[in-house]
Regions:
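Short beta-strand/loop segment at the start of cytosolic alpha/beta domains
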Residues: 1-16
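Short acidic-hydrophobic, aromatic-tinged amphipathic segments that line or gate anion-handling sites
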Residues: 107-109
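Amphipathic alpha-helical interaction surfaces in cytosolic regulatory modules
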Residues: 21-105
Length: 109
């Protein structure tokens, strides 16, 4: 089973995921993230950069699909440069971001 939790703290919006983030589950995850970002920004204009920080916590994630990587890229584009990060990656997931050349631009740790 896949789940996603949202927490707001100060100027941070934290998303905690768990499970197997394959293409099927990533569809509703994407919709949930977009909804939450738009609510927080007060706008659904993708060109408008959010002023808050976004963190994806992948501590309990066992797999990510290319669709989830796309979600990470699109979310990072919704906030100002440096305001997106991915934390608590499994070593194999971190390697996936590194192979894709996204580990630094998405602040993967």
């Amino acid at each position: 089973m896949v789940s996603i939790e949202y927490k707001e703290a100060d100027n941070n919006l934290n998303f905690t995921f768990n499970g197997h983030l394959d293409t099927n589950t990533s569809t509703w995850i994407n919709e949930s993230i977009i909804k939450e970002l738009n609510n927080r920004k007060g706008s659904d204009n993708p060109e408008e950069k959010a002023d808050f920080k976004v963190t994806f916590d992948l501590l309990d994630v066992s797999y990510i699909s290319s669709y989830f990587i796309r979600i990470c890229i699109l979310t990072a584009k919704q906030v100002k440069p440096g305001n997106f990060r991915i934390i608590n990656c499994d070593p194999m997931i971190k390697k996936t971001f590194k192979i894709a050349g996204l580990d630094e631009s998405l602040n993967v740790s």
